[in-house]
Amino acid sequence: MTNPNDRHTPRAIKQTMPLAHEVVEALAIDNGVCIRPVGLRRMDLKTGISDIINAPCGATLEAKCPPCAKRNRALRKAQCREGWHLTTEPAITPDEPNDYQRHLVEWRADAQALRDELESAGLPTDDYDQAIAELDIEINAAGVRGNVLGRTASKRSRSTRRRQDAPDLPKRAMTATTLGRTYESPDGRSYRPSMFITLTLDSYGRVNNGVPVDPATYDYVKAARDALHFSKLIDRFVQNLRRVAGYDVQYFATVEMQKRLAPHLHMAMRGSMSRADIRAVVAATYHQVWWPSCDTIRFEGGHLPVWDEKAGYLDPATGEILPTWDEALDELDADPDAQPLHVVRFGPQIDAQGILSGTPDADQAIRYLSKYLTKSLGQAADSQAARDHAARLADVLRYEPCTPTCPNWLRYGVQPKNAKPGMIPGRCRGKAHRPEHLGYGGRRVLVSRKWSNKTLSEHKADRRTWVLEALGVADEPANAGRYVWSPVKAGDPDLPPIRVRLLRSIRERLRWRAHMNQLQAAANGLDLSATTGRAA
């Protein structure tokens, strides 16, 4: 073997040799070890012993940490598979409140009454406000979800009358079930098929291999706004789907980008509907964005609104106070001829397939659903034309408001909601404005509450329990009061270098794998060699 430290070794040959730290990372990836572990200090209050634990970073993207992304993808696949073809109703029945919980709420009622009396008399209520806040914390700590007052802020609403250009949806009686219809075959067997649905957005212009044929006529503004509000459109589609299906439809969905850089939806739906009904639901689904107009630019370049501590943002030339977010919406509500800023709809391309449990089609659909979960939405383009297309879309997205709190509203003469000093149009830190998201600020994976009757943490715990049982290791019961966890700062003398921690984790993983192989061989009646780990 050529020695890289040999001075006589040609430079060209040295450059072909792998770097040592790259070999460590490659070995860690091959063995499923997180390459960006987070150091946490664990203090055992029972024994007084303190040690450092390497916690996985939990990244979901392969570009950041392939092992963690792979584990997350496997976890999502298990979640999808477990809930898609359930045959029994998920039992989600809240427990009856116990005596202690009732007692706390009674105290809360007394405190609220006394506080209201003081407020009516014009007396200060600070002491009771603090007591009520502490009672609310105690009520939640006792195992009660939510807040006793519910929503306290008023919610702005508009007319719910449907648009004239949208077809009406059929009304069907709702059934208290999350399971779809059961079909009987002539031989007496029962089938309860489910569906795999793919929906896309509308066209913005002709494309060839994902690139606009004529960028000048391609509607980048519509593409950007559709991406920004795509998550709201999905919510509306689910509402309409349940209304037409006649039962509480459960779903597992993922969002990914098409080659033209427009988001589209893949949805595993429990139960089945006719394709005609699904097409009707898609045609009738839309989302209106009732925001102030942002088609006219008022401030740009060096001419930007200035901040005043008392009034908020002002016009730098005239000193005029810009309308606040609520004032802009009030003006919009008062205009009887007002039109929504944007209306987002699905496109005409719809794919709906019937899927039976335990078939190759079901396995293939689950693989397809999770195929791109480890990839960034803004995956690197493979050609210069595609990179130019992505750059043009990013330029439009840069100044499109993504939320009511987006600094880009200043560009159009409106103060963002909860305005604060330092806001600059074009520098929003929102998720939708990041290059890797291409305008879509929602979640990549959408799972209904009654899909598998388990949270993602519970699915993770199931996998952990299986591994511990296979290793023959007893699961230590959770003891919330025994350990105190704290992050370890970079440069802490107790924190070993990252390469040392990776080497230790690799060794530990190899030991676990050898133990697993021995247990599997013993179960199959084989004898593993102590040196090679292969069957003798």
Question: What is the meaning of each model-derived region?
Answer:
Residues M1-V105, Q112, D126, A133, ...:
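Long, low-complexity, charged/polar intrinsically disordered accessory regions
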Residues L233-A245, V281-C294, L373:
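Hydrophobic, Leu/Ile/Phe/Ala-enriched alpha-helical segments that form helix-helix packing faces
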Residues T60, L228-K232, R236, A276-D277, ...:
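Generic recognition of stable, solvent-exposed alpha-helical segments in well-folded globular domains
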Residues V221-A224, D308, R345, L356:
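N-terminal ectodomain recognition module in secreted, GPI-anchored, and membrane glycoproteins
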Residues A268-A338:
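Helical (often loop-to-helix) elements that flank the catalytic cores of nucleotide-handling enzymes
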Residues R73-R76, G205-N209, A276-I278, G378:
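Short helix/loop capping segments that flank catalytic or ligand/cofactor-binding pockets
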Residues C65, I197, D248-D277, V281-V282, ...:
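Histidine-centered divalent-metal-coordination microenvironment in nucleic-acid enzymes
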Residues A69-R71, A111-K259:
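Signature for HUH/AEP ssDNA processing cores
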